[in-house]
Structure formats: structure tokens, C-alpha cells
Amino acid sequence: MCIRDSAICAMYMGEMEVTTTHNPEGTGENFSAGSLMGQISFSRMLTDRFSFGISSKIIRENIYNSKATGFAIDLGTLYITQIQGLTMGMSISNYGTKMKMEGRDLLLQTEVDPSLESDPININANFATDPFELPLIFRFGLSYTKLISKDLKCLFAIDALHPNDNTESINAGTEISFKDFLFIRSGYANLYQRDRVSGLSAGCGIKLKISSSTYFIDYTYVDMGPLGNPKKLTLSTSF
């Protein structure tokens, strides 16, 4: 059996006031920042217990008038154990190109040679930013599903993360589903991570089946400590 999915995820941080070294109290202008990701996924059952999946995605980040774009893939496997309800999996996420910020905010004017005695000649220049790696992550996780009643079931999950840009950490969470339509979720991220910021998260979602397609709408609240409490709205579909 083959499964194909597509998804679009967006994060918007709202407007913030522009400050500079000359105007630390603000210039009167505002700026915003955000991220956008489009993804197409393919998975296949290799046996009745073992499956494999791959996702390709385009990632875009922007702040004020500058942006960066990159391409990455995710690879993962899933194994249904002989213990009823217990599943294990592993994955590699964000294996792809480097990203680099570009845009008119990085344009400036500079003198050709300040040591020359002639009148200064300013030319347009571009501030060259360094390319940066996507956060490559290796995950290993376990999940256990408990059927409470015909319409109600509970999922417990835990996974360990090994990233290329931070210390190792653990995520844990639970999901309660009603009639495979309404979902309530809660979890805790980045346990044991050094200098962690995010922590408790909670949210809900619904699953809609229309014709031969399935649509998912999910809302999430995340505690980001000193960065505030962002909210995420995710829309995805499978066909």
C-alpha cells in the first residue's frame, strides 16, 4: 500500500518595533518575521509490520525585507512490534541544502577606498551573510496506544533526539482521540536539553473525510519561555 500526503505549515511572529543603535527607543517603523514550509510525502508498507516514508519540502524564512530559502528531505521507518499497541520508529529530518539570508535590508553604500584624498565615491554593496545549516535531527521513538472504549482511545509517545546544533533531549506527550474525529493533545518538549526554551505544549485538532481525501486542522499552544507563547495553526491533507 502506498500513501501520499501534502502539507503547508506557517509561523508568524507578529509585528515588532524597529530599533537601531542611533534609535534604541524605536524608529517608528515595524517589522515582522515568519517561516513557511510546503511538503510532499510518500510512504509504503513493505510488510504488514514494517513501513518506510520520505518527505521533500521547501522551506522559507523571512525577517523584515530579507529572506532565505532551502530544500530538504525527511526519511523515516516504522515498525509495529508483536506487543499489542506498541510501535517503534526512527527518522532523519532536514537533510538538505544550506540557507542564506538575502534581501534589500543587506544593501548598503560604502566608499571605494577611504584612504584616497579625492572626493569619496560611494558605491552600492551587498552585506554578504554566511550560509547556515538546517537543523539536522536523528530521532528514535516509541508509542503505545490504549483502547479505552469503542470510540475513545489514548496514545502515549516518547522520543529521543540527537541534533547537529544542540544537546540531546527527550520529548514526551499524549493524545486522546474521540471517534477518530476530535483530538486533544498535550506534551513536554526538550527535556534535559541544555539552555532549553520551549516546554509545555497543548492543542486540539479535527479530522475531516471528504470524498476520497482526508483533511486535518490542528491548533497548538506552545510555552516558549522568554520568547512568549506562540500559537500554531496547521492545515494538511492526504489523498
Protein language model annotation of sequence segments:
Residues 1:
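Sequence context surrounding c-type heme c attachment/ligation sites in exported
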